[in-house]
């Protein structure tokens, strides 16, 4: 495995560990999820460029669209929880059930 791919994989694993360790605050979890999506985007982009597979060139763009949607929903949820409860603890999300 090339050095660049190894570094990107380590960045993904570090962001995943960040989600597991800092799971009490919503903002920390969202930042770690963005790090995971960024490392996945770079890895998919490098893979499609190295394989010269023309049909997969759209995959990084689709991944960016999903990352943008995830960020928008996460930030909307963060604003709603912060305005309602005054803090961004993830345990407050259990209270949002209808």
Swiss-Prot record:
Q: Where are the transmembrane segments?
A: 1-21, 26-46, 61-81
Membrane topology field? Multi-pass membrane protein
Q: What is this protein's gene name?
A: MT-ND4L
Task: Return the GO cellular component terms, semicolon-separated.
Answer: mitochondrial inner membrane; respiratory chain complex I
Mention any Pfam family matching this sequence. Answer: Oxidored_q2
Question: Where is this protein chiefly located?
Answer: mitochondrion
GO terms, biological process: ATP synthesis coupled electron transport
Q: Please give the Gene Ontology molecular function terms for this protein.
A: NADH dehydrogenase (ubiquinone) activity
Query: Tell me, how does this one assemble?
Result: Core subunit of respiratory chain NADH dehydrogenase (Complex I) which is composed of 45 different subunits.
Known EC number(s)? 7.1.1.2
Keywords assigned by UniProt? Answer: Electron transport, Membrane, Mitochondrion, Mitochondrion inner membrane, NAD, Respiratory chain, Translocase, Transmembrane, Transmembrane helix, Transport, Ubiquinone
Protein purpose: Core subunit of the mitochondrial membrane respiratory chain NADH dehydrogenase (Complex I) which catalyzes electron transfer from NADH through the respiratory chain, using ubiquinone as an electron acceptor. Part of the enzyme membrane arm which is embedded in the lipid bilayer and involved in proton translocation.
So which domain of life are we looking at?
Eukaryota
- Family assignment from sequence similarity: Belongs to the complex I subunit 4L family.
Give me the reactions it catalyses.
a ubiquinone + NADH + 5 H(+)(in) = a ubiquinol + NAD(+) + 4 H(+)(out)
The compartments listed are:
Mitochondrion inner membrane
Put simply, this protein is called NADH-ubiquinone oxidoreductase chain 4L
EC class of this enzyme?
translocase
């Amino acid at each position: 495995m090339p050095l660049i791919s190894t570094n990107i994989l380590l960045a993904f694993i570090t962001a995943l560990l960040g989600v597991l360790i800092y799971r009490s605050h919503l903002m920390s979890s969202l930042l770690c999820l963005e790090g995971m999506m960024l490392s996945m985007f770079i890895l998919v982009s490098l893979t499609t460029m190295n394989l010269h597979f023309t049909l997969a060139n759209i995959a990084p763009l689709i991944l960016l669209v999903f990352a943008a949607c995830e960020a928008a929903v996460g930030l909307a949820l963060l604003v709603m929880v912060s305005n309602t409860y005054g803090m961004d603890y993830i345990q407050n999300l259990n209270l949002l059930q209808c």
